Amino acid sequence: MITGYMKEMSNTLNSTFAGDEIAQSWSDLFIFERTFQEFKPDLIIELGTYLGALTHFFSLHGKVWTIDNMDRKFKKYDNVLYTIDEVFNPLMEGYIKCLIEHHRQVFFFCDNGNKIKEFNLYAQYLKKGDIIFVHDWENEIKMEDIQETINNEDLKPYLHELSEKYNSLLRGWIK
């Protein structure tokens, strides 16, 4: 019964988390929760803040750095660094690379304006044990868009079966 409910709710628009509109579904949050039960990253990097509800969810699981190219109004949290910038700005790229290098384990989430480019650019900086997820799987990003990077960086699928089971638009990999 839960499985049927999760499938039904998986792609529901206008989902909320803690009363705020969120672009992810409840099945996505379930997958993130499973990830954070298994891994305890000391930094969560989120590309694409949107309205900040997922940022709030992430903040319950650790220190977050969220980057968006638009300045929007949303709630602020003490363990979140908010940055308004282009994620492909060479200075921003260098800063992200440095942060990844200097943290024990990083959870990296691609959900800004160009998920293909985000994944293909930033996956190269991940260390062994780091995790990368993308949103809008099969809509805005497909396997053929990132297969070369997956192979080159020796990324292994993470919770893909669960994502498929619950019709989630997430896909994750671990290095």
Name these PLM-found stretches.
Residues 1-108, 112-175:
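A short alpha-helical cap/connector motif
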